[in-house]
Amino acid sequence: KNGISEIISIIDEFNNKKIVLFGIPGAFTPTCSEEHFPGYIKLYDKIIERGVDNIYCMSVNDKHVMKSWLISYSDDHKIIGIADGNAEITKHFNLISDKTKNHMGFRSSRFVMIIINNQIISLKIENPGELNVSTAENILKDL
């Protein structure tokens, strides 16, 4: 948050809030960097206008990679990054994706969820290699 890395509890962080959480396979990867994340930057205000408290982007990357990737866009976007370095959250939600054939290890599936008061209201998971259901444009339809 605000360029500062800290350990958080997502249960505490998401408590009594309406959250959009989207997951990406990896920071600095082409689709994530050129399409998925920029779409949320572009539509941030429209999503927040629908009563969303915060937008989070999660990836199975360490905090240093995630921080560098987030600030590579600008210092003024408001999307909060979650570095799930050990894939604990990703595994908990059963959103792990085996990318070992591509020499990328285990990553997050590409997904988006709406969470209200720590309850998942909507979850959309992309088919491997696709970017359709988890875009910012599509999440606006569900809000």
Enumerate the predicted regions with their spans:
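Chalcogenol-based redox active-site neighborhoods
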Residues: 1-143
